[in-house]
Curated annotation (Swiss-Prot):
Its main location: cytoplasm. It is an enzyme of class 3 (hydrolase). It is found in: Cytoplasm. This is ATP-dependent RNA helicase RhlB.
């Protein structure tokens, strides 16, 4: 991993609890990223923080280190009961909650603080069994948290730290009432440490969030540059008829080690998945219709490298840290400008370089001007030769068919290339 995204500030330079420093260093974390270097001095002094930084810059570790330090440095309420967690971390999606919990496990092993996880979809009794034994830090989604609270399985009266992760997404998804319901059951803002982190924070979000924070300090990293400078962007104008052929030709040319393809609807994602699966790619599908256990399995397979391509709706565009994603394809230009930033932010993370390739088809090209205005620059345009597109593609697979294994050996570059798929099939537009 590249070190160029790190600062010269060491975690050991801060007055972090020794167990936190030991846990961080045992996992190879010695130097801070910019958002960590900005946020930690504030949280260690007891100040509330609202942090804005691009995805992949270490927001999760910033609030986890702060949370563990605070709990280790401040005693629990003497009257705290078993069903009362000391810290609550709220996330907008199940996948993000699972990921935060996984990251927190790296710190919990050496600190002795117990973790709990609460998210909807499945695992109700399994999650509840952990909570019944008592947890210090509870990570979850708002719906399941409220469910447990109403059933008195958890009580928020002893909360000392609260975190809102991907806060703008929380509000955009309509969770503001749920968040306020949970906050009303916690101690007053002045009696707890409050943190809010996201890649984008609108003024509306900041105003709503500050209702639940104690004179929070606002910190940001690279606020004027909405897309990472390590991401190379590229744009094509395909016709609807050539769009799929162009995508598959680009995949042949780029041969990405690990890529995510975003489309705007679950039906479009299923169609893209079907074409790529039929063509022999090791591809996974992530939409809202995919069962929770399968979603987690697909993410694990993608992270571990047993599948190379993930086709997804924007359910996977927020917060998830999947290392070493080399390419992002916008098969559809998103309707929301912020989603473009979050999508391509899946690559070029943690000091690595990445590539973003967008297809501005007849249906979604109208979204381009607003996106370019929002990111503050035009996306470089490339042209392609229609006659050179792949033209012997198999019929797409359908989800209703018995699934064919996509986890076989990956095709090698030495395999015969089919007609119509020469490399360097494109050139920059003048």
């Amino acid at each position: 991993m590249s070190k160029t995204h790190l600062t010269e500030q060491k975690f050991s330079d801060f007055a972090l609890h020794p167990q936190v420093i030991e846990a961080l260093e045992s996992k190879g974390f010695h130097y801070c990223t910019p958002i960590q270097a900005l946020a930690l001095p504030l949280t260690l002094s007891g100040r509330d923080v609202a942090g804005q930084a691009q995805t992949g810059t270490g927001k999760t570790l910033a609030f986890l280190a702060s949370t563990f330090h605070y709990l280790l440095s401040h005693p629990a309420n003497a009257e705290r009961q078993t069903n009362q967690p000391r810290a609550l971390i709220m996330a907008p999606t199940r996948e993000l909650a699972v990921q935060i919990h996984s990251d927190a496990e790296a710190l919990s092993h050496l600190t002795g603080l117990k973790l709990g996880l609460a998210y909807g979809g499945d695992g109700y009794d399994k999650q509840l069994k952990v909570l019944e034994n008592g947890v210090d830090i509870l990570v979850g989604t708002t719906g399941r948290l409220i469910d447990y609270a109403k059933q008195n399985h958890i009580n928020l009266g002893a909360i000392q730290v609260v975190v809102l992760d991907e806060a703008d997404r929380m509000y955009d998804l309509g969770f503001i009432k749920d968040i306020r319901w949970l906050f009303r059951r916690m101690p007053a803002t002045s009696q707890r440490l409050n943190m809010l982190f996201s890649a984008t924070l609108s003024y509306r979000v900041r105003e709503l969030a500050f209702e639940q924070m104690n004179n929070a300090e606002y910190v940001e990293v690279e606020p004027e540059q909405k897309t990472g400078h390590r991401i190379t962007e590229e744009l094509f104008y395909p016709s609807n008829e050539e769009k799929m052929r162009l995508l598959q030709t680009l995949l042949e040319e780029e041969w990405p080690d690990r890529c995510i393809i975003f489309a705007n609807t679950k039906h479009r994602c299923e169609d893209v998945w079907g074409h790529l699966a039929a063509d022999g790619h090791r591809v996974g599908l992530l939409t809202g219709d995919v069962a929770q256990k399968k979603r987690l399995r697909i993410l694990e397979e993608f992270t571990q490298g047993s599948i190379d391509i993930l086709v997804a709706t924007d359910v996977a565009a927020r917060g998830l840290h999947i290392p070493s994603v080399t390419h992002v394809f916008n098969y559809d230009l998103p309707d929301d400008c912020e989603d473009y930033v979050h999508r391509i932010g899946r690559t070029g993370r943690a000091g690595q370089s990445g590539f973003s390739i967008s297809l501005a088809c007849e249906e979604y090209a109208l979204n381009l001007p607003a996106i370019e205005t929002y990111i503050g620059h035009g996306i470089p345009l490339s042209k392609y030769n229609s006659d050179a597109l792949m033209n012997d593609l198999p019929a797409p697979k359908r989800l209703t068919r018995p699934p064919r294994s996509n986890n076989g050996p990956r095709r090698h570059n030495s395999a015969p290339r089919r007609s119509g798929a020469p490399r360097n099939n494109r050139k920059r537009a003048d």
